[in-house]
Amino acid sequence: MGKLYSIRNMATGLAVLSLNAGSSVASDNQLKLSGEKPNVVIILADDMGYGDVSLNNPFARTSTPAIDKLANEGICFTDAHSGGAVCTPSRYSLLTGRYFFRVPKKTSYWGYLAPLIEPERETIGTLMQKSGYTTACIGKWHLGLNWGRKDMSKPQIENAKVLGYTNTDFSSSVTGGPNELGFDYSFILPASLDMPPYTFLRNGKVIDPNIVLTAEAYRHALDRTVYAWDRKHTNDNDVYWDRGVWWRNGEMSKSFKVENCLDEIVEEGISYIEREGKNKKPFLLYLPLTGPHTPWMPNSQFSGTTELGTYGDFIAQVDNVVSRVTVKLKELGIDKNTIVIFSSDNGAPWATEDILQYGHQSNWGRRGQKGDAWDGGHHIPLIVKWPAKIKQGATYRETVGLVDIFATLADMTGQQLRTNQAEDSFSFMNVLNGDLQNPTRDHIIYLSSAGKLAIKKGPWKYIDCIGSGGFTYPSELLSVKNGPTGQLYNLADDSLESNNLFLSKRGIANDLSELLKEFVNCGYSKNLTK
């Protein structure tokens, strides 16, 4: 344990907090449980890179005035990370406070997969319910559901690619979703907007059970030039209109419109805020968006309004969502005591060819893209605003993760977490309290789309493979004789992860590898460094 101990103390004093002039938190403004409990709104963008927020990227070709305003009125975390480099792992971590690699069985049937969160597992929904909150999940779910079957003697899905009709009974109740996991109200899309089934569910019931195939509802456009990233995800059965404007063939409610999906989610969210904002009971709204994930289909208000094509237009629409939510909170007079958290589930799927074509770096300052173990896969924007308690314009550089939201909400509501609850979540309430001396965590673990793990501790980052571990080619390389078997980077000097120090700093690499194994095998990480 001697080596592990030395690694754990390697990061002492490295966390830095920089505050804009006049933005320090006053000592008499400590967060307390006395008084009215705050409402909580969590807006989770889908596939939005750190550099897509114009405030974060000095050369951004996107414009996000509402998100920038949110950051200027709250705290902006510049080293925030998702629990995984793709959708489902990240959402699991946010809702449960656990890393996704702890899930024993993982399937990939798109929106048809079985529930990944056990019924007895605590979520931020159940956590806040215990503190007297009304809770809602409105938006993209992507954590599995129990669908009914037309013929119980047959499997639900014959083909894992789900290109046509399935054995799903869309008229029956659906369980295993938000309503069974701590959310009083739900309005959800089962998975990503490019994955079947394309349908909305309200409180476990499909709103429109009249099912067609996307091929019947939308024309194909297969003669376009398909970019390399898209080519990996498309085939002759899918709808393909342009770079990023594609979705898989499959079952779809007859009334469902891909181009209207985000608007419908936002309307539901705004209606919920209006309804619950008039009540005395505090509310938690988890609002996971479908944009700017593919298909990049902004509505007519934003189509063609930016220099960045359909992707930039979709970013503008996502920014407008933030504007609409914050404006509604102010209209209702509840903005002062409402915590608004904005983030993204992973980095953007923005390949080298996109950077060359558009001159924009969605994952600004980091190597790689969505799916990768490199920082571009999981480095995300994270902004927290709470006017009643937080002074404006703070920038916090210490490492935090979406997985930490669970413990932070528990801290905020005065709840003591059990040992087997939110096993990987660290509260960053100290930051909101203005405590600049004690870091939230001294390590964080990442999971790539290919199941590769990485750990960051202090300036050092170790990846347990050679290659991106994700969408960027090559995902994984075979090691050669006397060559590295993993990757080690000093992020303090090499934020682009270009100089692999695995061989020259083998001792550090080995220690981090062992520490990673310890965290994985013991079943938790939140108490090992305390």
Identify what each model region corresponds to.
Residues M10-S18:
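Sec-dependent N-terminal signal peptides
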Residues K3-S6, S18, S23-Q487, S495-K530:
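Formylglycine-dependent sulfatase
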